[in-house]
Amino acid sequence: MSDQQPNEGVGSLFFELAGNLRLSMLTKLSQRNYRLSQLASELDASMQEAHRNMTRLIDSGLVAKDKEGELVLTAYGRTVVMIIPSYDFLYRNRDFFLDHGLGGLPPKFIQRMASFQNCEIVHGVMAILQRWKSLYSESEKFIKEIMAQVPLDLIETVSSRVESGVKFSYIFASNAVVPKGRTQLLQKIGWRNFISKGLVERRMVPEVAVMTIFNEKHGCVLFPNMKGEPDLNTMFYGEDREFREWCADLFNYQWEKAGQFDESKLKHEV
């Protein structure tokens, strides 16, 4: 096999993006227009080095010069730059994705992994449960979630928000194992009454690989391990609008596929 520069196909694009200086130039140009001398100065590069790399970007159609002689991203270049953050996120978290899957997510979700780029990674079951509790407690309009497991300790936290008028919508896996005492607790807090009032709505899917919980302010996502089960030891937590939209789109996608909630399918702990 030859290691020479590819002349056509997507390989030629990846080759142009392979240089750190060229990537930095594209990132800078996505923010504003530059003259080459300004760009070289901000990136601490020599004029010779900057000129050589910029010539490549211009020849590849990613960058052009405007009437004032300033460097600008072409429409094609701007589109390419918008896609780079998805690769950046996957690269920065490559150790995680070496032993975690994406749970069979449709391509339209995988192609938007850039939505995760500003997320915080939360480690440990206790830390994750605490974040869930805070998310529930701070909800003012709604809570939506897709769950494979039922945390008994948080049911009362959710119910207190529902009592305050927060709408709660959730999707359970039909093979979820529910903790002992859940049925009695739901009866105690009047869960059926919440459902009849339309404050709580629920549906069911055969299984859940990717979990999410989100409200109008925050969101979190848990991906599955190599067994296909959500890893409750690592969670992506974020506040960005794009990330919350990703969570909402995943929820809506699963909600449309989900069937009627059937309590009898749930496995109860002995």
Regions found by a protein language model. Give the residues of each.
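Residue at a beta-strand N-cap/secondary-structure junction
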Residues: R32-N33, E70
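Basic, amphipathic "hinge/linker" alpha-helix immediately C-terminal to the N-terminal HTH DNA-binding motif
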Residues: D66-Y87
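Short beta->alpha linker loops
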Residues: D44, E68, A127, Q149, ...
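Short hydrophobic/aromatic-rich beta-strand segments that constitute the beta-sheet cores
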Residues: L73, E145, C220-L222
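Short loop or secondary-structure boundary microenvironments that flank
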Residues: L29, G77, M147-A148
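PLD/PLD-like phosphodiesterase catalytic module centered on the HKD motif
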Residues: S2-Q31, Q38, L43, E49, ...
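PLD-like (HKD) phosphodiesterase/transphosphatidyltransferase domain
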Residues: F97-I171
